[in-house]
Amino acid sequence: MNRKLFILIILFTFFIFFQISYAVDYSDVFITYKGKDLGQFTLKNSIFEKDKIIVQENDSYILSPVIKLPFCFEECVPSWNVKCSDESSFCVFVRFGKSDSENKLSPWLLMGEWGEMSNYKTLKSYLDKSQIEGKFENPFKYSGISIETDYILSKDKKFDLIQFCFIFNPNYVVEFSSLNISASTQRGDKKLKLYERTNLGKNSYVVVPFRSQGWEDKKISSEICSVVSTATVMDYYGVDIKTAELAKVAYDKRYKMYGMWWRAVQSAHQYGFDGYVRHFRSFEDVKEYIDKKMPVIACICVNKNDIADDPQYETDGHVLVILGFDENGDILCADGGFRKEEDGILSYKREEFEKIWFVNGGGIGYIIMPANKK
């Protein structure tokens, strides 16, 4: 065999092997339970009716099946759509297991609360009273796994089973519409070479009514980027809610913050919207939504020198709305951190946005849409 040809074959084989290894270095999965899928849930003092679960009595619970993920995850981001009155409340618990250990599950951890905040003793009494199998010990940590405000982190990547439990104290009827789970084998995405620049279409975007974080309540203006982004998308679909009003709904009393991911989705659901949080790994993923005229809410993190035009800008967390792609194929956004629309509707170079969203921000985004929109 010709020596040069032999070397080329070896190099080509190595290249293919490297690309395959590179591409499968992490995995993502998005799982949703809604409609008839909710018939798989175990219920107490609740009924499955017309593709929803109706909760009508106190001491009710909804228990998901034990969900088998296709891998042991590092990061899991859940969200849900539960419609309830101002007087109703519920707690969300989660536990984990490994499929090769006789499906033994961990104690329950506290994922979140809606409505009146409870102390840990009361939370434990909810589980005890419901007679759900399982313990409630440390509310936020267990054997290498922890609840990190609005997502689940498993540094050891040793769990591939997950189960959720919703315990309710409804004063009025509560409707449970969906449970959504986005899981990944890694938190950030440092493999930008996976995403070669493709033709995403130029001048392909939606137009939203701009709103600023600083237009209403100045006391919280620096804390409500998630709320403003959610309100912007709701306004785009025709529901104009004051930002300050939505902020009251989205505020988490335990963590004392407005920007929790699942709470953004849950808040919008109170006004007739469905939604979920998920991992995005490429702008091809985004294009699927833009083609349907659906804006995408993105959670970014910016280090100094990440943005060439503003090298001193940095933030450990900011939320804005992706509108689509400008005339250069770069990323067109609505950023409520600006006071004026002419400043807040802006484009990011694709490579820079890849870094601040996919790499630094882990590709976390949420979709808000009118109920029953596909």
Named regions from a protein language model:
Residues 105-157:
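Extracellular carbohydrate recognition and processing domains
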Residues 57, 64, 240-373:
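Conserved active-site-adjacent core of cysteine acyl-enzyme catalytic domains
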Residues 55-72:
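Short beta-strands within extracellular/lumenal beta-sheet-rich domains
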Residues 8-17:
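Bacterial N-terminal signal peptides
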Residues 20-59:
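Glycan-recognition and processing domains
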Residues 25-40, 68-71, 87, 99-102, ...:
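Noncatalytic regulatory segments and standalone regulatory/sensor domains
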Residues 72-84:
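A short beta-strand element within beta-rich, extracytoplasmic domains
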Residues 20-23, 30-32, 159-161, 165-257:
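Active-site-adjacent structural segments surrounding the nucleophilic cysteine of cysteine proteases
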